[in-house]
């Protein structure tokens, strides 16, 4: 079979002006970035606000293997299948980060015959959103350091600046740096560090803002440092929220592209789900809901991370909650959760599927807590056997969850038709009655305990010394009514990445909290989750090249 990029490059793309007509968008409603990419205008987003929202389908997954379980691919294939059934459907997905593209993942725009196009552009610089976010973030860093240099009227303690610089690359050497070295004219020497751009609070803000006014307010509410007397310093104190909004005025507009089958796709924003809230922008999802009868969206990593955050953090900012949740499972991941070594995953092992099913079962039970119907999608791989598939289907029937095999990677829309029909049937027959897991009025401590015990299956939460101090401080600052965004490994329900399956009787330790007051949540740090990833021994970048005619090579 052809590689992803060979398939993508074999497709005759339609002009984006033709694609968007399918959902009632005219040429005057978009700003073109070449023939095949566009941004949606503020005017059009405002004009459709009165429209009744369509059906919303959230795609999530079990705890993944390092290669991922195909959520984006499944989301794309499901949307294509729904359109093939005659349902007016749009996609609302995240845009890839260049760091993982060059690192472990290669391309991140779907796969096989379920891709968004032009995949080379989407995976590289796209419409420049990542660069705008990086620039806004680092402009704020420069303005903070300039404030220190020019007299420090706000009394910022250089030892307590919590705002870091960012870069859209995996670069472990930049995790901790010293800035301001050389001489007094180079600034005030202090410790600093770099995060990856998608971990920036500005990325989260862009994805939760509802318009330019809301974007500016959220930027003003960012906490960047503390004074010598331990009081928080906000962006509004520096009076630069207007400048940051100006840098982001185009980046806030959702991007329009197409799938291989011509399904319109809004791709916008890309926070990671293990260190941020893991969902595409509220603007993209809300607009898709008001343009189409069905919107398919995804949340990063497993349902314990992305879907939990989608349902607790993003949904309150949307016109409606999901009508159905699709949990993607692969037999290779279930076997891994059942104790099979990575090198042996290709061998048939029905017993391991049974043991690993505990992971999928917990995710199904967790999503049902939110009172939204659940469907399981088995993402088919060549090594899957009939006996393993039959075993998994029987286990799903035991817990009364609908299950369908999907082969969208190999067969595109046709490979997703059975899943699409089941999802539509479930939506028609089972009305969602969305219920949030916790209330804003709960304390931060109560919210964390709720997530750990109700979603992760943990026994208790241990708060480290710094976290205990912060619980008191944050209550004094009025931040304790914000939602909690857990930073945790994606590979396990616990904070130990090697504890697979569905562990119980474990504790999770919160070592510290990070205020993201502009985004409107508090991050709880567990384990050794890094906000600046490193590259693997053999980076995906080593297989990439460009032909003499400018064609991209090796993007998977």
Curated annotation (Swiss-Prot):
| Cited CDD domains | FTHFS
Q: Do the record's keywords include ATP-binding?
A: yes
User: What reaction(s) does this enzyme catalyze?
Assistant: (6S)-5,6,7,8-tetrahydrofolate + formate + ATP = (6R)-10-formyltetrahydrofolate + ADP + phosphate
The protein's UniProt keywords, in alphabetical order, are: ATP-binding, Ligase, Nucleotide-binding, One-carbon metabolism
The EC number of this protein is: 6.3.4.3
Q: Give the Gene Ontology MF terms in alphabetical order.
A: ATP binding; formate-tetrahydrofolate ligase activity
Q: What is its pathway?
A: One-carbon metabolism; tetrahydrofolate interconversion
Which EC class, in a word? ligase
* Highest taxon listed in the record's lineage: Bacteria
| Residue positions binding ATP | 65-72
The disulfide bonds in this chain are none
Gene3D superfamilies, from UniProt?
Answer: Domain 2, N(10)-formyltetrahydrofolate synthetase, Formyltetrahydrofolate synthetase, domain 3, P-loop containing nucleotide triphosphate hydrolases
One GO biological-process annotation of the entry reads: tetrahydrofolate interconversion
- Cited InterPro entries: Formate_THF_ligase, Formate_THF_ligase_CS, P-loop_NTPase
Family, per entry: Belongs to the formate--tetrahydrofolate ligase family.
* Protein name according to UniProt: Formate--tetrahydrofolate ligase 1
Organism, scientific name: Streptococcus pyogenes serotype M6 (strain ATCC BAA-946 / MGAS10394)
């Amino acid at each position: 079979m052809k590689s992803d990029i060979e398939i993508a490059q074999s497709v005759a793309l339609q002009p984006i002006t033709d694609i968007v007509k399918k959902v009632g968008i005219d040429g005057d409603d978009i700003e073109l970035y070449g023939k095949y990419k566009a941004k949606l205008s503020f005017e059009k987003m405002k004009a459709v606000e009165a429209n009744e929202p369509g059906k919303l389908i959230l795609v999530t997954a079990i705890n993944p293997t390092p290669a991922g379980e195909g959520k984006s691919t499944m989301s794309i294939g499901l949307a294509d299948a729904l359109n093939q059934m005659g349902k007016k459907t749009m996609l609302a997905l995240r845009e890839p980060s260049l760091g993982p593209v060059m690192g472990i993942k290669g391309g991140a725009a779907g796969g096989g015959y379920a891709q968004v196009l032009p995949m080379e552009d989407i995976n590289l610089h796209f419409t420049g959103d990542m660069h705008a976010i990086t620039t806004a973030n680092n402009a704020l860093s420069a303005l903070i350091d300039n404030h220190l240099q020019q007299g420090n009227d706000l009394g910022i303690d250089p030892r307590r600046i919590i705002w870091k610089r960012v870069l859209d690359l995996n670069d472990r050497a930049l995790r901790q740096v010293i800035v301001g070295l050389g001489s007094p004219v180079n600034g005030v020497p202090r410790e600093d560090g770099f995060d990856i751009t998608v971990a920036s609070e500005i990325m989260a803000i862009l994805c939760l803002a509802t318009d330019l006014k809301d974007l500016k307010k959220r930027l003003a509410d960012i906490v960047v440092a503390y004074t010598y007397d331990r009081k928080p310093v906000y962006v509004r104190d520096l009076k630069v929220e207007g400048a940051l909004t100006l840098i982001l005025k185009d980046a806030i507009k959702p991007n329009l592209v197409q799938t291989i089958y011509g399904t319109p796709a809004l791709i916008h924003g890309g926070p990671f789900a293990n260190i941020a809230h893991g969902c595409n922008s509220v603007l993209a999802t809300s607009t898709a809901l008001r343009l189409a009868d069905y919107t398919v969206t995804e949340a990063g990593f497993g349902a314990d991370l992305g879907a939990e955050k989608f349902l607790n953090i993003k949904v309150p900012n949307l016109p409606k909650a999901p009508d159905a949740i699709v949990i993607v499972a692969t037999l290779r991941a279930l076997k891994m959760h059942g104790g099979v070594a990575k090198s042996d995953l290709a061998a048939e092992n029905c017993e391991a599927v049974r043991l690993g099913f505990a992971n999928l079962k917990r995710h199904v039970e967790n999503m049902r807590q939110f009172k939204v119907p659940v469907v399981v999608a088995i993402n088919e791989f060549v090594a899957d056997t009939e006996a393993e598939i039959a075993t998994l289907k029987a286990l799903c029937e035991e817990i009364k969850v609908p299950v369908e095999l999907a082969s969208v990677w190999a067969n595109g829309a046709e490979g997703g038709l059975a899943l699409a029909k089941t999802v539509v049937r479930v939506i028609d027959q089972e009305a969602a009655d969305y219920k949030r897991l916790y209330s804003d009025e709960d304390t931060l401590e109560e919210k964390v305990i709720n997530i750990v015990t109700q979603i992760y299956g943990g026994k208790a939460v241990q708060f480290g010394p710094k976290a205990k101090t912060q619980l008191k401080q944050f209550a004094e600052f009025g931040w304790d009514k914000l939602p909690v965004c857990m930073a945790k490994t994606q590979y396990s329900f616990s904070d130990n990445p090697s504890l697979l399956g569905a562990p119980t009787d474990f504790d999770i330790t919160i070592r510290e909290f990070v205020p993201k007051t502009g985004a409107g949540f508090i991050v709880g740090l567990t384990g050794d989750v890094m906000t600046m990833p490193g590259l693997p021994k053999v980076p995906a970048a080593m297989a990439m090249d460009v032909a003499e005619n400018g064609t991209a090579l090796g993007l998977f």
